[in-house]
Swiss-Prot record:
Pathway the protein takes part in: Amino-acid degradation; L-arginine degradation via AST pathway; L-glutamate and succinate from L-arginine: step 3/5
Catalytic activity: N(2)-succinyl-L-ornithine + 2-oxoglutarate = N-succinyl-L-glutamate 5-semialdehyde + L-glutamate
Any Gene Ontology biological process: ornithine catabolic process
Gene Ontology MF: a single term: pyridoxal phosphate binding
Gene behind the chain: astC
Species name: Escherichia coli O17:K52:H18 (strain UMN026 / ExPEC)
Name this protein carries in UniProt: Succinylornithine transaminase
InterPro entries: Ac/SucOrn_transaminase_bac (IPR017652), AcOrn/SuccOrn_fam (IPR004636), Aminotrans_3 (IPR005814), Aminotrans_3_PPA_site (IPR049704), Class-III_PLP-dep_AT (IPR050103), PyrdxlP-dep_Trfase (IPR015424), PyrdxlP-dep_Trfase_major (IPR015421), PyrdxlP-dep_Trfase_small (IPR015422)
Function: Catalyzes the transamination of N(2)-succinylornithine and alpha-ketoglutarate into N(2)-succinylglutamate semialdehyde and glutamate. Can also act as an acetylornithine aminotransferase.
Enzyme Commission (EC) number: 2.6.1.81
Keywords: Aminotransferase, Arginine metabolism, Pyridoxal phosphate, Transferase
SUPFAM superfamilies tied to this protein: PLP-dependent transferases
One Pfam family from the record: Aminotran_3
PANTHER family assigned: AMINOTRANSFERASE CLASS III, SUCCINYLORNITHINE TRANSAMINASE
Highest taxon above the source species: Bacteria
Length: 406
């Protein structure tokens, strides 16, 4: 018999780049999880906006099992039917003409930045290599993407960083305009800064970036790793704004919990990538592609996307009610089912402590920095699960406030 696994084993065996919760989930169904002791949690964290259809969705299990009974992997020397079907679904549903598949959002952003550099070098020369990104952004953990993310805490220990990356203030078109010029090859931006505090871009800001990119022959990259696949109430957030990027990255919810990422591109942009210019061993894996294809089938419907907007209203109404009682938050903001509760000045920096109280009360939430409690639940979360989970969250907030004032 194998030895029992405990949370302490993490501290003994794992490289300590995470500080996971003190409990270990072992089973999930819908928006509920149970830990090793059988305690139930309502999951409003969603695997950080990954579990778009909740845990153990029966149709996703069926898609995975069906493909698993056929074959698992061949490598990029061969294509497969599931990945081609998935590519066609993404092309039909978006602006894109071409798709590159990988395993994560970081890989998708890495591919986008490499493509942008190559596009500029091929068309205009090697002097056109500048990348403009934004402060408090997050684009992944590779050296290139962590450098593009405007959070020094994630990159400062890994110098020297890739050059020619500059950061403007988010939602400030004048700040961006001061950096974007004819040496810029790309601008990369999140339509909603997720890790940066759940901050939606303004319409004028994204339209302004599109105009600046057009003026200076730079590619506009939308990082929709967190906002994509129905999270905001549209299949992709760019559809809210009426701004079409040249490149778009997607991952997280695309696999519903199975690792998959993709770079979507126009024909013109994709044309600079030829055999051998980029690649990945596992990207386009038939298991991942079969699951992602079913995810798109289930999410890209008017009923599901309209339901996300309805659920947004459920959350915001109830969170405002909670806040009216406990007075923790200065603002509830976001789009669709990516929602942030901003702590007021009296509780600044204590988002982690609130998330820990929430877990004790039986509800899982996220943070986005020290000042924002973040919600990214399943897109099909039921009204009963919302009510139960937010009742537990309210109890956690009450306990947190009373403990602080006692």
């Amino acid at each position: 018999m194998s030895q029992p696994i405990t949370r302490e084993n993490f501290d003994e065996w794992m490289i300590p780049v995470y500080a996971p919760a003190p409990f270990i989930p072992v089973r999930g169904e819908g928006s509920r999880l149970w830990d090793q002791q059988g305690k139930e949690y309502i999951d409003f964290a969603g695997g950080i906006a990954v579990n778009a259809l909740g845990h153990a969705h029966p149709e996703l299990r069926e898609a995975l099992n069906e493909q698993a009974s056929k074959f698992w992997h061949t490598g990029n020397g061969y294509t497969n039917e599931p990945v081609l079907r998935l590519a066609k679904k993404l092309i039909d549903a978006t602006f894109a003409d071409r798709v590159f598949f990988c395993n994560s959002g970081a890989e998708a952003n890495e591919a986008a930045l490499k493509l942008a550099r190559k596009f500029a070098h091929d068309r205009y020369g090697s002097h056109k290599s500048g990348i403009v990104a934004f402060k408090n952004a997050f684009h992944g953990r590779t050296l290139f993407t962590v450098s593009a993310g405007g959070q020094p805490a994630y990159s400062q220990d890994f110098a020297p960083l890739p050059p020619d990356i500059r950061h403007a203030a988010y939602n400030d078109i004048n700040s961006a305009s001061a950096l974007i010029d004819d040496s810029t090859c790309a601008v990369i931006v999140e339509p909603i800064q997720g890790e940066g505090g759940v901050v939606p871009a303004s319409n004028a800001f994204l339209h302004g970036l599109r105009e600046l990119c057009d003026r200076h022959n730079a590619l506009l990259i939308f990082d929709e790793v967190q906002t994509g696949v129905g999270r905001t109430g549209e299949l992709y957030a760019y559809m809210h704004y009426g701004v079409t990027p040249d490149l778009l990255t997607t991952a997280k919810a695309l696999g519903g919990g199975f690792p998959v990422g993709a770079l979507l591109a126009t024909e013109e942009c994709a044309s600079v990538m030829t055999v051998g210019t980029h690649g990945t061993t596992y990207g386009g894996n038939p298991l991942a592609s079969a699951v992602a294809g079913k995810v798109l089938d289930l999410i890209n419907t008017p009923e599901m996307l309209n339901g996300v907007k309805q659920r947004h209203d459920w959350f915001v109404e109830r969170l405002n009610t909670v806040n009216h009682r406990c007075g923790l938050f200065s603002e509830v903001r976001g789009l669709g089912l990516l929602i942030g509760c901003v702590l007021n000045a009296d509780y600044a920096g204590q988002a982690k402590q609130i998330s820990q109280e929430a877990a004790k009360a039986g509800v899982m939430v996220l943070i986005a920095g020290g000042n924002v409690v973040r919600f990214a639940p399943a897109l099909n979360v039921s009204e009963e699960e919302v009510t139960t989970g937010l009742d537990r969250f309210a109890a956690a907030c009450d306990h947190f406030v009373s403990r602080g004032s006692s």
